[in-house]
Structure formats: structure tokens, C-alpha cells
Amino acid sequence: MLKASLISIASYVPEKILTNFDLEKMVDTSDEWIVKRTGIKERHIAEGEITSDLGTKAAKLAIKRAGLEKPQIDTIICATMSPDHLCMPSTACKIAANLGLDYGITAFDISAACTGFIYLLQLANSLIKSGAKKNVLIVGAEKLSSVVDYTDRSTCILFGDGAGAAIISASNENEIIDIHTASDGTQSHLLITPGCGSAYPASDETLAKRLNFIHMSGNEVFKIAVQTLTKSVIEILERNNMTSRDIDFFVPHQANIRIIEAVKQRLDFKDEQCVLTIAKYGNTSSASIPMAINDAYESGRIKNGSTLLLDAFGGGFTWGSAILKFGGKNFYQI
């Protein structure tokens, strides 16, 4: 059977930085309060760029690092909860056009909120193993500043903009070992952007009620996330006869330091195994895991052959875990 490998990784963040001290001037909050509750010190905000721009810049670097020519990419899948356009075209199609791959390539979006990158891995893994595709570009890209209410201190402190991209290719080494994804739509109201879809079409009323922004029941989400992520990781480790000691790096979705620490302690991961970027990027939803992997890769921590365990939980609710060997035969070395 064909194997699928993550053969390149890249990320992009916009230049503007919004610090906690900047937010102190906008809402009733403080740097101390934000850091204590979330672990976030700053986040990047896109000005003059849209989601497809962010995704394109990460994608270009991922393709370069993979040593591939653009025509060798046969599929682009983008995970985003802040697409360029509500209905169409897909952000993936616009990224394809930006890359000059504007005819004949398979391109589509998925919506799995903060679990988006793990869903992307599962799709790409299946396409490669089935023989349907050879080189799949997966992109998690978010301009969350466009869907955040900067008068709501419970949410505006959390989110940032950015993109991460990876190439998944057919390979005989460093394979994606296992992926688990799941969902529970019965609790979707706890983390939701209510407006601008068919449930509450855009109107003066929905805009006045700020239904076009992210709404979150933070305490409930925290409890469910910790329980669900812990169970998800335990299941995937047991399914593969592994423990936390078989993992080189634990790369969680960067949502909130308290969630990460709670899950880490329950799973017995050591500090040196954990990849954390939340302090400088905040929560970038579907982009957070590839951005974190790329940071650890560029700093020399994650290397070709490293065993990674990824986990994420997001709106929907969606969640998932993945175990993979990082890199491949032609992996780009910094």
C-alpha cells in the first residue's frame, strides 16, 4: 500500500502585531489578565491582505521546500473559518489562481474550525493512499480579525491571523501513522458565528446584534475541550501501542495555555516535548498547528524523522488527533 508523508512545512504571519497593551486601550482588560487566563502576549493582524493572500504566501514556501514544481501539485485543500467569500468561490480556488494553478487542479475548502488541519491531514492521507493523488497541498489560513468583535473582551483577546501550509506526498518513509477525527454537533451553540449564513442572513438586525462575529461560552468550552482532547489522544496512542514516551513532540492546537497545560499533565508529556507558540500568535484556528510545527522546525527542534503527536478541538464541536513521522527522503533541511 502507498504511504503518505508530510514532506514540507511552511507558515506566514502578517507584519502588524497587536499586543495586550494595545488591547488595554480598546476594551476593559489588562496584559496581566490576558497572560494569566490565556498565555497570549500578542497576535498578528492582517492589513491589506485577505485569507487567500495569507494562504498563498505559506503555500509558495511549502512548495519551494518540497522541491516540487507547481504543476506537480494536483490538489489544494484549504481549511478556514474566515474565507475570502461566504459562499463562493472557495479560498482554495483563489490560492490555486494566485499560484498560477488556475486550470484543471482539484481545489476545495473544508470547515472544521480549529481542528481544520487534522481534518486536512486525514483527507490528504486518504487521497494519497488510494492512489487518486500524488502531491496534495494543504493550507490552514485564517483572517480571524475579520470575524472578531473588538468590543468583546472575552473573544478579541484570543485570536490572530496567519497561515500554515504543508505538502503531503506519496512516499515509502516517514509516513502519517494514524489519524482520528470526530464531531458532536449537539453542542454547536457553545462556539459559533451565528450570523450571515442561511440561519441568520445578513441584515441590519443581525449586524446590530453583532451576530457576524464569534460567540463563545468560554467556561463550558474549556471543560469539554480538556476532557475530549485527553480522551482522543489516549485512544490514538493505545490504538498504536504507544505512550507519551514514544512521541518526540506534542503539538497541540494553540487555543489557550490552560487547556494545553491541563491536557499535557493528564497525558504525562514533559515540557521539552511540547511545542508552544500561543504567546506570540494567539489562536489562529486551522493555521495554529502548521504554524507551530514550522516554528519548531525552523528553530531546529523538530527534525526529519521526528515523531509528532497533534491534537485539536474546535467549533462544531470537532476534534482530532494524529501521529506522524515528520519529513521524508527529499525533505528540505534548513
From Swiss-Prot:
<comment type="function">
    <text>Catalyzes the condensation reaction of fatty acid synthesis by the addition to an acyl acceptor of two carbons from malonyl-ACP. Catalyzes the first condensation reaction which initiates fatty acid synthesis and may therefore play a role in governing the total rate of fatty acid production. Possesses both acetoacetyl-ACP synthase and acetyl transacylase activities. Its substrate specificity determines the biosynthesis of branched-chain and/or straight-chain of fatty acids.</text>
</comment>
<comment type="pathway">
    <text>Lipid metabolism; fatty acid biosynthesis.</text>
</comment>
<feature type="active site">
    <location>
        <position position="283"/>
    </location>
</feature>
<dbReference type="InterPro" id="IPR013751">
    <property type="entry name" value="ACP_syn_III_N"/>
</dbReference>
<keyword id="KW-0276">Fatty acid metabolism</keyword>
<dbReference type="InterPro" id="IPR016039">
    <property type="entry name" value="Thiolase-like"/>
</dbReference>
<dbReference type="GO" id="GO:0006633">
    <property type="term" value="P:fatty acid biosynthetic process"/>
</dbReference>
<protein>
    <recommendedName>
        <fullName>Beta-ketoacyl-[acyl-carrier-protein] synthase III</fullName>
        <ecNumber>2.3.1.180</ecNumber>
    </recommendedName>
</protein>
<feature type="region of interest" description="ACP-binding">
    <location>
        <begin position="254"/>
        <end position="258"/>
    </location>
</feature>
<keyword id="KW-0443">Lipid metabolism</keyword>
<dbReference type="GO" id="GO:0044550">
    <property type="term" value="P:secondary metabolite biosynthetic process"/>
</dbReference>
<feature type="active site">
    <location>
        <position position="114"/>
    </location>
</feature>
<dbReference type="GO" id="GO:0004315">
    <property type="term" value="F:3-oxoacyl-[acyl-carrier-protein] synthase activity"/>
</dbReference>
<dbReference type="InterPro" id="IPR004655">
    <property type="entry name" value="FabH"/>
</dbReference>
<comment type="similarity">
    <text>Belongs to the thiolase-like superfamily. FabH family.</text>
</comment>
<dbReference type="GO" id="GO:0033818">
    <property type="term" value="F:beta-ketoacyl-acyl-carrier-protein synthase III activity"/>
</dbReference>
<feature type="active site">
    <location>
        <position position="253"/>
    </location>
</feature>
<dbReference type="InterPro" id="IPR013747">
    <property type="entry name" value="ACP_syn_III_C"/>
</dbReference>
<keyword id="KW-0275">Fatty acid biosynthesis</keyword>
<dbReference type="Pfam" id="PF08541">
    <property type="entry name" value="ACP_syn_III_C"/>
</dbReference>
<keyword id="KW-0808">Transferase</keyword>
<keyword id="KW-0012">Acyltransferase</keyword>
<comment type="subunit">
    <text>Homodimer.</text>
</comment>
<keyword id="KW-0963">Cytoplasm</keyword>
<dbReference type="Pfam" id="PF08545">
    <property type="entry name" value="ACP_syn_III"/>
</dbReference>
<keyword id="KW-0444">Lipid biosynthesis</keyword>
<dbReference type="GO" id="GO:0005737">
    <property type="term" value="C:cytoplasm"/>
</dbReference>
<keyword id="KW-0511">Multifunctional enzyme</keyword>
